[in-house]
Curated annotation (Swiss-Prot):
PANTHER family registered for this protein in UniProt: LOW-TEMPERATURE VIABILITY PROTEIN LTV1-RELATED, PROTEIN LTV1 HOMOLOG
Keyword ATP-binding: no
Biased composition (Basic and acidic residues): 28-37, 453-462
BP GO annotations: ribosomal small subunit biogenesis; ribosomal small subunit export from nucleus
Lineage: Eukaryota, Amoebozoa, Evosea, Eumycetozoa, Dictyostelia
Annotated GO CC locations: cytosol; nucleus; preribosome, small subunit precursor
Stated family: Belongs to the LTV1 family.
Entry keyword set: Coiled coil
Protein's name according to its UniProt entry: Protein LTV1 homolog
Region (Disordered): 28-66, 217-236, 400-462
Residue stretches in coiled coil: 439-474
Amino acid sequence: MPKPFIQNKNKQVLATFTASYRDRHGRETGVRDKVISEGEEDYSGEDNFSGEEEYEEYDSDDSEHDEYIQQESAKKEVDDLSTIGFKKDGFDYSKYMRPIGGGVFIPAIWDVNELKNKKNGIVELVKNSEPAPFMFGLEEISKDYKKDVKDLEVDEDIKEALVVDDEEDDFEELDDDFILQANGGTLDGLQDEVDETINKFNNFRIKNKAYDFIDDEEDYNGDGEYYEGEDDDDDYYEDDEEYYKNLKNKSGNNNNNKDDGRKVQDEVLEAQFEIALEQYEDEDIGELEPEETLGTCNVNNFEDVFDEFIDDYNKNHEPLMVQIQTLKKNNNFIALTEKEKEIILKRDWNKEVLVEVSDHENEENEDDKWDCETILTTYTNLENHPKLLREEKKIKLSRKTGMPIGVIPTKQKGDDGNSDNEEEDEEEDEKSVNLGVSRKNETKESKKLRKQQLKDDRKNKRELKKDLKVAFKKEEIKQTSIIKDQKTNSSVAVRY
């Protein structure tokens, strides 16, 4: 083998890649420089290709595409407005912008690794950058402003299309073959293509009968084939009425076969419909079980029930006036009408009124003929409790408490266990005299006794009032505890 030009020991691998084509302002420069850098040291020569193989794999179209991209990128103009956020539409946005000055320009960072290499982060970039010049940004905007009238003019064709006249004659009616006219073709030139599409469509229908799109089966001859007329080409673009007339004339006797087929379909549908109706007429619905008869019953056993129902029905269906009269007899609070008042005033009250008495009432009166002794003998000792007859005492209420006197025993402090009767206390209250008022011809000793007695009475009242408060508090605590117990017992559920 010949000795290689470069030995493996001394060779150095280089890799080429495209550098970033954005400047420090983030604008596209349109220039892509090839940068050469050192490759990896551990690179092995297994993937080396000869020059002929590379040339075979590289297509000429790729080279042309690369050249086209380079040319287009060179033609691109630098759009300063896009970097600021405005459209390049010919409008002078600098009129409405405030000039910038005295600030610090922070450059756009396109590579994050570049920011990581900085120790102080973005602060270091701001220090190294230049301050923003006065009127920065406005010059770039005003530079792209189109001041020439020629550049802003609209084409005459667009103006004519936008102009709309009020006259109806100005609107042109489109022909049926306006698509062909727009493409610059004629019917004669496209007739072959139309025939091919028709034949393809007919073949598709023959293979797939389920996708037959023609109404009423006008082209079907009954033998599984579709016929094509002789003059289909001439009549294809004529009016619809003439087209359908020709098809009906060409069908001929094939309509009989179609009628027979339709009759068979109608009979099948009717049979299916009758079967569905029979299913709905069945009384067995779902999974319900049929009713079972438990046996026969005599109607005479229910005569009392029927009679009661008839009586209630007659009572509830009486005339309205009769119902009102019965209500007024039973209820004295219902007001009378003026007519009823006039009838009552005109009535002769001295006249005797005969009242008919039914046999049923006489039967009830016979039961009342029993003596008191015989009736008392019918009662047992459980119901009959003999005792002395006494006059019932009237219940007297206390003025202080409002409770009945003699029902609740009360004890007073200072007594030796012998409580006075409530009636005596009430009598003493009635006999009590106002001790706070001085009397005529009162001596000093009597006055002193009166004041001492008044003090004792007030002291006793204060003690009673205090005892009453304590009793109420105890009862309140007791009732609250009872209510809590009831709530807890009601909320607890026990399962066995």
